[in-house]
Structures are given as C-alpha cells and as structure tokens.
A protein has these predicted regions:
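Active-site-adjacent structural elements that line small-molecule/cofactor binding pockets in enzymes
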Residues: 1-306
C-alpha cells in the first residue's frame, strides 16, 4: 500500500508555511505522494450540494484561502524532490485544455516526471456560472479535454475535432517525461465517472468512500473495462480519505471519517481498502494548525503504516 498526504491549499490557515512544512514532513517520512485540491473560489451563498458529505455542506467559506493547484504544486516541486505530485482532483472543464496541458506537462518536465492528474467534472453550479463554463455539459467537456490532453502529449502534430473544442496546426513541445503522458486518475464514483475511468483512465480515484461501497464500485468498474476492451488490472485504484484523526470519529461532514478512531481501527480499515483493490490512499489530515496535522502524520507513521 502506498500513502500520500493531502495538503490544505483550500484552507483557513496561513497557506505558505503550512503547505511547505507538511510537504517537507511528507518527504522526510517517505510518503509516496503529496496532493492538492481544486476550486477557484467559494461563493458567499452556496447551496448544500457537496456530494461527499451526508449534509451536502462543503466545510469551507468564501473567505478561506483558496490557492490554485497547479501553481501550488509548482512551488512545492522546487522544495521537495521525492514525493509524486497529485491533484485530487483538477476540475477539467474550468480551464482551457491547451493551456492546462501546457501547465501539466511543464510541471512534469521540471519535476522529473512526478505528476499525477486526478481528473474530475466538478459539482458546484455557482462556480461554473462565474467561470462561464457549462455545468450541463461538464461531463462531455471533460471527456473531450482529457482526449485532447492525451493527444497533445503523444502526437507529433496534434489534431482533435470535437463538439466543444478543436485543435489543428500546432506543435506541442516538450512532451512530458512520463510516457505516454502523466497518469490520469479519474475521480468520482457515479456511473459516468466509472465509465470515464474505464475508457480513458490510468487509475480510479474516488474520495470519501467506505471500503464496502468502494468494493462494489470496483466490480462495476471491472465490468465497464471489459466493455471498453481494457484490462482492469492495468487501472490503479486509489482513494482520498479526509479527516484522518485518532481518538474520535473525525466527523466534520455529517458522517464519521473512514480512517478515524484508534490506531487498530485505522489499520483494520486500511486492510479492507486493500482487500477491495486499493493500492494508494491519500490522507486528508484533520487539524486546525500545522503542528496538529504534523503530529497526526507522525503518529500515523509510528502506529499505522508498516
């Protein structure tokens, strides 16, 4: 089992030193990856539509510090040279696909081939409206933009003729260090997300999903891979688990966090994830201050991680 640390680039704490301290601790303790999340802003008035909590509440406010994920990873890539650099997840329809591909490939080149592209469609209508992106078309746009990303990374003369975007007559260099492209880990666990992972993903990366539900979804994913003519064994299964906490439920979104309680409880849950096919867990550490989060990380290493 590999482990990553989710960094609070969407947070109420002072971001710069917190992100750097946590990334350096992740490197010191030999975590496999560090991860950031994606929003451009949080509205002052937000409907309770967050799909990964029982209440629909996001748990962030409009005045929290919201840092761009790609810029943040570029900053951290120059400070830590061990862990892979993941986005959990980049909301694909928010940004121009060519510019996004250029930023991702640049980061992959400058970091020595460490990028993991977690890819999602987004869920917040208010954010789509402000960015003048189509919420209704977000799934189809995501599919096209991911195809464009792969085309730009691999083709000598990239071309694409889609419903929402077309490219031709352009050179796209350099190509990424990772071949054929940085791995795409598709987020979400709706049927559409699973179908997307089966079609275009190098991995599947749902968030805040319990082991039993994940195991059921893996069975569905394997069937969809067979329909798409792909070997399901070639897809890496990962999951992000937020609010990792010792000694309590970790409950901040209306239901207990899967990785909470005693060290033995957490170990047992990790084993259930592993039995379901998970090979990489991203830990979202609960805490209001960096020192508190670092204590939890160190305790996880001492008492839980093999």
């Amino acid at each position: 089992m590999q482990f990553g640390i989710g960094l609070p680039n969407l947070s109420y704490v002072d971001p710069t030193q917190t992100l750097l301290s946590l990334a350096q601790v992740a490197q010191e303790l030999r975590f496999d990856s560090i991860w950031v999340s994606d929003h451009v802003f949080i509205p002052f008035e937000l409907a309770p539509n967050y799909p990964y909590s029982a209440t629909g509440q996001l748990g962030l406010s409009a005045t929290d510090h919201i840092l761009d994920p790609l810029t943040t990873l570029s900053f951290l890539a120059g400070r830590v040279d061990g862990p892979r650099l993941g986005i959990s997840v980049l909301i694909i329809p928010y940004r121009n696909p060519i510019v996004t591909a250029k930023m991702l490939v640049t980061l992959d080149v400058l970091s020595g081939g460490r990028v993991i592209l977690g890819a999602g469609t987004g869920w917040m209508p208010e954010e789509f409206a402000a960015l003048q992106a189509s919420y209704a078309d977000r799934g189809r746009v995501t599919d096209e933009y991911l195809d464009i990303f792969k085309e730009l990374c691999t083709a000598e003369k990239p071309t694409f003729d889609g419903q929402h975007y077309q490219i031709s007559n352009l050179g796209f260099y350099p190509k990424p260090i990772q071949k054929p492209h940085p791995p795409i880990w598709v987020g979400g666990y709706s049927k559409a997300a699973l179908r997307r992972a089966a079609r275009v993903g190098d991995g599947w990366h749902p968030s805040n999903i319990d082991p039993a539900t994940l195991a059921d979804k893996v069975n569905v994913l394997h069937g969809l891979c067979a329909e798409a003519g792909r070997d399901p064994a070639r897809l890496e299964i990962s999951t992000r688990v937020n609010n990792v906490a010792f000694g309590d439920s970790g409950d901040t979104v209306g239901r207990p966090a899967p990785l909470s309680g005693t060290a033995q409880n957490i170990i047992d849950t990790i084993r259930r994830y592993e039995d379901a096919g998970v090979s990489h867990i991203v830990l979202g550490i609960r805490g209001r201050e960096p020192e508190e989060m670092i204590r939890t990380i160190r305790r996880f290493v001492d008492e839980v991680r093999p």
